[in-house]
Amino acid sequence: MSTAAPFEPSRSDRRAVWLLVGLSLVFAIVPDNFSLGTVGIDANHTIMQGSGLRQIQYGSLFLWAAFLAWRHLSVTLSTLRAANPFLLLVVAYCLMTALWSPYPDITIKRSIIMIGLVLIGVAVAPPVGAPRQFLRAVMISYTAIMVVSFFVALLAPSVGVDTQLGNAWRGITWQKNMLGSISGFAAMLWLREFLIRPRKSVAAALLFSLFMLVMAKSATAILVTGLGTGVYLLTRHRLMGGRHAGVMVLLSALLGCLYALLFFYVAAGRMPNVSDVVGPVTALFNKSSDLTGRGIIWDLVEVAIDQHRVWGIGYSAFWVGEGGPAQYIANRIGWMPGHAHNGFLDILVDMGEVGMGLFLACLVWHAGSLMRLFRIDREDAAMHLGICVTILISNFSESQILRDTSFQNIMFIYSSLAISGRLVQARRARLS
């Protein structure tokens, strides 16, 4: 039996966690060039290509995280050893693709950002951060952005309202879908707070989040928020007894998917494609099955995937703007997208089947870690699961996962490492 004293973080450590999580998300969501009037294509390219200010912002956070990790080196190493190994392999493979990337400088820069985000995630994971501090930091950060966006939309509609998209609100974010997405995550997190502590102020924050979600007029955000919230509500209470209940639910869901796949194959004589999967759902929102014209982009991206099927073209080396590998897409559709509008296609074009295999293994490991967390803190595990489902589903129409400073990618990395930290804490508690 261990007699080592439990780790006790200082007040400054906890403040550092709030700031590292909050600022890294704010920097990802709020434009870095202060040109809030920019919409559409130009904004997308600023997001994807980065800027000197963005490098200073995240470089400062990475140095701060490195200092925090060094201060608590033994805790950092314990969390790192318990981390999802396939997440670390994905990041390592991102860097490795610089060997054949047509733009190795871009690949290396973006890979360094991924490494830095992992460093922040390790530095702020429990026990340095409180068990639920990461999710509360996300909630407060998104709420602050929504409050500022609310006043900007009312007082400066030329900046905060997108007149080209039905007067949808975008506030101080890049575009309406981003405001809708963070409003959805905030609504989920405030709902959890209300279920734990049903107070009027919490209810008001929840209603405000839902109001901002509606005003953003993002059907995708509304859909995935509803699905993620449903997963959270269904799993936060034990539906069946036994220590293997979570595994049984997971296997039952997998079996249901396999039966649905078999039924479709027997009925249609082929495997389902993206349109078959998303069509019935998007029809509820009067959207086409290719999610408003994204289908032509997907078809064109698949041409590049076929050319670099195994290893990929190189991490973040495809969507590099005019004259890059994606130029043929711009020539066909008349404008240059910033991404494929499908995160999974972007993984394939950047990192090939090897990278996709590592990412799928990362998800399987993440699911296993969640099952273990359910035995320790069911409430927290249910929310992490709901967030994961929301991120994965939304990436069928937006490219966020594994896209360096995309805020959903940041959330996924931090969530994975926060879970690892919780599991390390639980193991130490059993041994003490």
Regions found by a protein language model. Give the residues of each.
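Alpha-helical transmembrane segments of multi-pass inner-membrane proteins
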Residues: L61-A65, V91-M96, Q133-Q164, T173-R238, ...
